[in-house]
Amino acid sequence: MSVLLCVSHLFSSVTNLFSKALGPKYDGKYLRTLLNDQLGDTTLKETLTNVVIPAFDINHLHPVIFSNVKARWDELKNPKLADVCISTSAAPTYLPAYEFQTTNSMGNTHVFNMVDGGVAANNPTLAAITQVSKGTNICEPFKTKPMETERMLVLSLGTGAAKNEGKYSATKAAKWGMFNWVYDNGATPIVDIFSDASSDMVDFHVGSFFQSFRCHKNYLRIQETDLSGEVALVDIATEQNLKKLTEVGKELLKKAVSRVNLETGEYEAVDGEGTNEEALTQFAKMLSQQRKLPLSP
């Protein structure tokens, strides 16, 4: 009997491995139903505040930045908000790609073949800054002149990063074939590498940008970089794990403000700037002061 159980377990493991290799981990049906039920026919231009949502079109192999400002002036860029949310969450290997289309009053259509926005902008901060900096050029002012950096405040909230130091090595990767780059011991190395690199480079460039204008305090990045276990995984939505993530967030507020070292790329605590909680309070005060200033002519 023990031999049969062992064979059964082995067969189950092999079947599970091939199912992960040959298709997405989830079918996405529940997520799509939930988003459509909650958002209904609400379109992108109807959002209550300005939004910038990245996704990636695998048919044209280029990023698509959904923006409510663009949506107000171009019907083909005004999809249902549910379609946008499904698109930007369609993470390769986890959820299936998503196709939808928009139609304007002239009968013209645009077909979108979308996957997760993280493919193009895992950290969308730079995409948001770009939209704001050119906002006055699309007939919808963001109340900021292009590149008026000293009046631009950027709060970037990361969703957490796993402690990956030592996870992969060149010695090990040198022996990998195509399959191992996609799947290795439950991880997806190629996805991990591209997503982390994308996010880190954005933080590096945005940090450099504000420091070059001597207004580094206008950019506040809050990110936990030491996650491990289930809280480091992107698809564990159990009540227990969500409570753990809440505690991680509370602890993060108590940690010192950190900023990326432009030489090493590592986050380092900044002397004299207090905790993240104190920095958020100060940031709110700065925002309040900015709101009181007269609009740029």
PLM regions with names:
Residues M1-P297:
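Conserved catalytic cores and adjacent C-terminal regulatory segments
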